């Protein structure tokens, strides 16, 4: 850079660039070398893109050792021996929205023509690894490093079950003399959780997320430690080869699979950008169903000759890009851990955190399940923690960022008495991880939660009886427990401030609540069973019981063995039912509801044909003429079983709009799939008769 060029950059801009470049390099060091980042991927991407934009505006700043021009951990010395890659191991450029994806596609297609074939691959959130095979035998494994030279981790890589020592020959794909293959090392979520649990048990700091744990495990000094950690690998590219020249990336993956190397079964070959966007949308919706974490979809031009024409920059190929989903993980401060008492008395610790945006919503609260889970995760009050929110799933605290501790953090101590009523807490039975408040009858927290639960959509579905109303009715003393709900009168509601106008008359909400309570007296029996707050009894078991017995008295008088024999019930739920009905005040609730006119038996419609007797039907997607509950009840009313998952025992799958993974499973197993019209015909006529031999 000449002095004239250097002088053209304003001093304040140069200072901004120097500070930003130094910050980015510090975070790269923590990520690639220490395996202990202190900011989220999204926060790093924002810093990196800010640096990139600054260099776009002032190209003079784009020097050779800028973080934007280097790959991964370039320039950092480590304790592992160096290993030179035979062909440069590049990174990927990222795009974060549809406009950026279209801009990338336009650049590609302007060079090679319209609507090429693309490969869409899951972007696994792990650590990159390069393997070299000579004459089919594993010679060396190396991390990415700076893209030219990485770290030799051969001994550790050999402990990974997915990495074969020798390649399997094939007539279609002879084993090449030289094969350099690239892939990603990662943890399955279940294995990551088991590893963290064992670390905490040994008094060691847990990993903050699966990516960090994969990097840390691959770079262990003792290969025996790596061997115990159940690392996995997926191959996603090739480097230098001798004796193998695939025409497409897709062909390369087929060969790798034949040779015994792991490739992702979800990879799709599509034509044109519209099909790419469809795959990105699909995995954006279904990524939480995978057994491992992904943070996006990698899009590649499939034709190898076209890849060569497009070439690469100093850090990434021009023929591939990573579409990154909004972050599902973020870092925030754990301000406190407080406990909540639920409707069955379970005492649950919750993490109260500085609100942070993650997976499209603001999160400030997450469950920690029980004291054992708090210990297993190794979190302290005051920690900076990693949190995850996957779709509509309740946010989860993954673990602490140990490097950011300053000594002010403190351990959480589970209370020994109920914070609501003062009753000593204890497990329901020996060995339970959860502790409970045994004062079920009069603990204020349990009363509130049970009254609120009665009105839930999965129970009696009483609009107007929310958490605020449940609290107000109990506080006013117009109900002692949920048994009094159906005896409520206008005078009772007038004594409750929430339902009284300033003029002293009943509010519109109060009138609606009384009307909705009357309507709730005529609901299906399974809803009544759910509303009683019997432990373990949810909608599925309740439906099975209602279908089998038809009325509450028969359920109450049935033996535990008889209840357990009902499909979908089993011994645990059966024991909970028997125990619940032996308690006097529980039976008093049933008697109060019965006395108030709540229907305790299903009225079987003799006109409804038993067309689905003995059949198992699964519904997936949205149906125009049925809600999900309506469809299930239609199946049950005709003698069928409405299952929640697809198996070889499933007789039919009904697929509406936007079906999920159940549809894919049905295709895989060859289960008959019906649209809504086919479903209506099945309900009316039953399955077609099998012709006699």
Curated annotation (Swiss-Prot):
Binding-site list for Zn(2+): 418, 421, 437, 443
Gene: ligA
EC top class named in words: ligase
GO cellular component terms listed in the entry, alphabetical order: cytosol
E.C. designation(s): 6.5.1.2
Function: DNA ligase that catalyzes the formation of phosphodiester linkages between 5'-phosphoryl and 3'-hydroxyl groups in double-stranded DNA using NAD as a coenzyme and as the energy source for the reaction. It is essential for DNA replication and repair of damaged DNA.
Gene Ontology biological process terms from the UniProt entry: DNA repair; DNA replication
Cofactor needs: Mg(2+); Mn(2+)
Residues in BRCT domain copies: 607-693
Domain of life: Bacteria
Species, as recorded: Mycobacterium avium (strain 104)
Active site, renumbered: 123 (n6-amp-lysine intermediate)
Record-given protein name: DNA ligase
PANTHER family (UniProt xref): CHROMOSOME TRANSMISSION FIDELITY FACTOR 18, DNA LIGASE
Coiled coil stretches, renumbered: none
Residues that hold NAD(+) according to the record: 41-45, 91-92, 121, 144, 184, 300, 324
Keywords of the record: DNA damage, DNA repair, DNA replication, Ligase, Magnesium, Manganese, Metal-binding, NAD, Zinc
GO MF entry, a single one: DNA ligase (NAD+) activity
Family in the record: Belongs to the NAD-dependent DNA ligase family. LigA subfamily.
Catalytically driven reaction(s): NAD(+) + (deoxyribonucleotide)n-3'-hydroxyl + 5'-phospho-(deoxyribonucleotide)m = (deoxyribonucleotide)n+m + AMP + beta-nicotinamide D-nucleotide
């Amino acid at each position: 850079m000449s002095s004239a060029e250097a002088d053209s950059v304003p001093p304040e801009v140069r200072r901004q660039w120097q500070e930003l470049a130094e910050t980015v390099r510090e975070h790269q060091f923590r990520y690639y070398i220490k395996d202990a980042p202190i900011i989220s991927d999204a926060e790093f991407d924002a810093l990196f893109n800010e640096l990139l934009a600054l260099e776009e505006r002032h190209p003079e700043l784009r020097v050779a050792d800028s973080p934007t021009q280097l790959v991964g951990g370039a320039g950092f010395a480590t304790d592992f021996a160096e290993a030179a890659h035979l062909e440069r191991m590049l990174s990927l450029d990222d795009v974060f929205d549809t406009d950026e994806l279209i801009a990338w596609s336009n650049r590609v297609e302007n060079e090679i023509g319209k609507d090429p074939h693309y490969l869409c691959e899951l972007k696994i959130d792990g650590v990159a690894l390069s393997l070299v095979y000579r004459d089919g035998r594993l010679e060396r494994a190396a991390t990415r490093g700076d893209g030219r030279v990485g770290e030799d981790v051969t001994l550790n890589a050999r402990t990974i079950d997915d990495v074969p020592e020798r390649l399997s020959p094939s007539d279609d794909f002879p084993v090449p003399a030289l094969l350099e293959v690239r892939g990603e090392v990662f943890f399955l979520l279940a294995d990551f959780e088991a590893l963290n649990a064992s670390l905490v048990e040994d008094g060691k700091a847990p990993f903050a997320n699966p990516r960090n744990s994969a990097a840390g495990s691959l770079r262990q000094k003792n290969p025996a430690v790596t061997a115990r950690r159940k690392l996995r690998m997926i191959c996603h590219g090739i480097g230098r080869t001798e004796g193998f020249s695939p025409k497409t990336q897709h062909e390369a993956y087929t060969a790798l699979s034949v040779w015994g190397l792991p490739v992702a079964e979800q990879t799709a070959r599509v034509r044109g950008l519209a099909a790419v966007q469809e795959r990105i949308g699909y995995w954006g919706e279904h990524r939480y169903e995978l057994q491992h974490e992904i943070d996006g979809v990698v899009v590649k031009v499939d034709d190898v000759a076209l890849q060569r024409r497009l070439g690469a920059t100093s850090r990434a190929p021009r023929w591939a890009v990573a579409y990154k989903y909004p972050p599902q993980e973020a870092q925030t401060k754990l301000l406190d851990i407080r406990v909540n008492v639920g409707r069955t008395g379970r005492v649950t610790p919750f993490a109260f955190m500085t609100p942070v945006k993650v997976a499209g919503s603001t999160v400030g609260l997450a469950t920690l399940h029980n004291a054992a889970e708090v210990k297993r995760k190794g979190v302290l009050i005051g920690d900076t923690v990693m949190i995850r929110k996957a779709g509509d799933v309740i946010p989860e605290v993954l673990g602490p960022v140990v490097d950011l501790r300053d000594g002010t953090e403190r351990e959480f101590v589970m209370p020994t008495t109920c914070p609501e009523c003062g009753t000593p807490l204890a497990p329901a039975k020996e060995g339970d991880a959860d502790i409970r408040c045994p004062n079920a009858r009069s603990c204020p927290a349990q009363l509130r939660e049970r009254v609120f639960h009665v009105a839930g959509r999965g129970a009696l579905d009483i609009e107007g009886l929310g958490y605020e109303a449940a609290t107000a009715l109990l506080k006013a003393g117009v109900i002692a427990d949920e048994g009094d709900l159906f005896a409520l009168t206008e005078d009772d509601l007038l004594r409750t401030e929430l339902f009284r106008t300033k003029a002293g008359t009943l509010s519109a909400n109060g009138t609606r609540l009384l009307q909705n309570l009357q309507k709730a007296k005529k609901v299906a029996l399974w809803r009544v069973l759910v509303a009683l707050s019997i432990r373990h009894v949810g909608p599925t078991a309740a439906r099975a019981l209602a279908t089998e017995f038809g009325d509450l008295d028969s359920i109450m008088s049935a033996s535990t063995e008889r209840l357990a024999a009902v499909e979908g019930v089993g011994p645990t739920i059966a024991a909970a039912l028997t125990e619940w009905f032996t308690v006097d005040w529980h039976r008093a609730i049933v008697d109060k509801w019965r006395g108030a006119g709540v229907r305790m038996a299903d009225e079987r419609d003799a006109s409804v044909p038993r067309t689905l007797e003995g059949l198992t039907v699964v519904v997936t997607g949205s149906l125009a003429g049925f809600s999900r509950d309506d469809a299930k009840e239609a199946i049950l009313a005709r003698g069928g079983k409405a299952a929640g998952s697809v198996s070889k025992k499933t007789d039919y799958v009904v697929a509406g709009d936007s079906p999920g993974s159940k549809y894919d499973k049905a295709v895989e197993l060859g289960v008959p799939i019906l649209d809504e019209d086919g479903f209506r015909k099945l309900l009316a006529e039953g399955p077609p008769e099998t012709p006699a031999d």
